[in-house]
Amino acid sequence: MKKFSLYTVTLVLISVFVFSCAPEEDGNDNAPIDQKQKWIGNWTCQETAGMNPATYTIHIIDSVGTNYVLIENLYSSGFSTRAKGLINATNLTIANQPLGSGGYSVDGNGNMANNTTVNMNFNVNDGSSVDNVVATLTKQ
């Protein structure tokens, strides 16, 4: 019995020592941050060039696919109208696509200057003319 107790105590002490020596987390595991998370949110879009520059709110929301987002109300087209954008770090690309059901199409790009400002250029084609828009997005 004494031999069993000594064996048990030794085993417990070794276990405590081994598990107490596990490396501590330093909070810097270099795990990749989902690059589109900084884009998601409500933004004020201030058009500075184009046919009729305007200021309005857009929503950038998560989309299916690793680096895709949906942009609601681009070109003040309504929050039910969405343009799909591809995020690559600080760059946003809007491939040519229909914008709503009124025969408009949109394409363009943007660059995130910092976590609260995006500089954008996009083109909206209504079938008869193209509006070349320059805009600044500011995160709300």
Predicted regions and their residues:
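Short, surface-exposed coil-to-beta transition loops
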Residues: 53-57, 78-82, 102-107, 129-134
